[in-house]
């Protein structure tokens, strides 16, 4: 059984301080996109995991954590074989590991017909990682607390297009948060502040990744004719551009946009919404870089 394991974007991310446990409190808007990995689950005589990136075929892979949590909860202990084909870069800030973990939970529930509810899967996901519960939402959601509390967001972002810019070097989440200063916190939580679409972690990450700061400024210059938003997803290192889909209704503007994407080596993707009674399905452009 093959399952699509999609990436996500943080369209904005606001830090509000630290909790009593020392974790950073935040508000973020999540959007699942039609770019991602493929996870295959099959019955086996023993537990195995094969990945096209050998460094991820380890006991530390979150797929194994999902399997253990699923077994503890359901008492289903049959051995399984996983095959993971990665396209999402490591340390990209677009939820690759979290998506794989969530997809593994969904796949196990389908494979063994354990009939766990979506709410149950979401609660299990909270035990794995901050972003994991997102993937049991519709695909558009607001994250609060430490990002793991998911609020439905029905204003589906289908009218926006996104262009991704990956980095050859990822960013560790712990490094991004270790460079946060108190002055980085957003003290306002009203709707206007949230929709400014800033990512407060940019201030932290740019302190030790000047290359990403310079890349963002370069992208802002390239995209300025289209008044597009340029931001960073999560803890980085992925930068992204968003612009209204309606801009492409003008053929000359559409051509200019796609020329800019090609010249800047971006990847054009779309927002993705989960099937009402199933999982996320990949779209036709999954394997195709923007041209």
From Swiss-Prot:
Pathway in which the depicted protein is active: Isoprenoid biosynthesis; isopentenyl diphosphate biosynthesis via DXP pathway; isopentenyl diphosphate from 1-deoxy-D-xylulose 5-phosphate: step 3/6
Gene3D superfamilies: 3.30.230.10, GHMP kinase, C-terminal domain
The keyword ATP-binding appears for this protein: yes
Catalysed transformations (reactions): 4-CDP-2-C-methyl-D-erythritol + ATP = 4-CDP-2-C-methyl-D-erythritol 2-phosphate + ADP + H(+)
Highest taxon, organism lineage: Bacteria
Single biological process term from Gene Ontology: terpenoid biosynthetic process
Residues annotated as catalytic: 8, 131
InterPro entries assigned to the protein according to its UniProt record, in alphabetical order: GHMP_kinase_C_sf (IPR036554), GHMP_kinase_N_dom (IPR006204), IspE (IPR004424), Ribosomal_Su5_D2-typ_SF (IPR020568), Ribsml_uS5_D2-typ_fold_subgr (IPR014721)
Enzyme Commission number(s) of this protein: 2.7.1.148
Transmembrane stretches, start-end: none
Any one GO molecular-function label of the UniProt entry: ATP binding
Keywords, alphabetical: ATP-binding, Isoprene biosynthesis, Kinase, Nucleotide-binding, Transferase
Enzyme class, spelled out: transferase
Biological function: Catalyzes the phosphorylation of the position 2 hydroxy group of 4-diphosphocytidyl-2C-methyl-D-erythritol.
NCBIfam families assigned to the protein according to its UniProt record, in alphabetical order: ispE (TIGR00154)
Stated name of the protein: 4-diphosphocytidyl-2-C-methyl-D-erythritol kinase
Organism: Chlamydia caviae (strain ATCC VR-813 / DSM 19441 / 03DC25 / GPIC)
Recorded name of the encoding gene: ispE
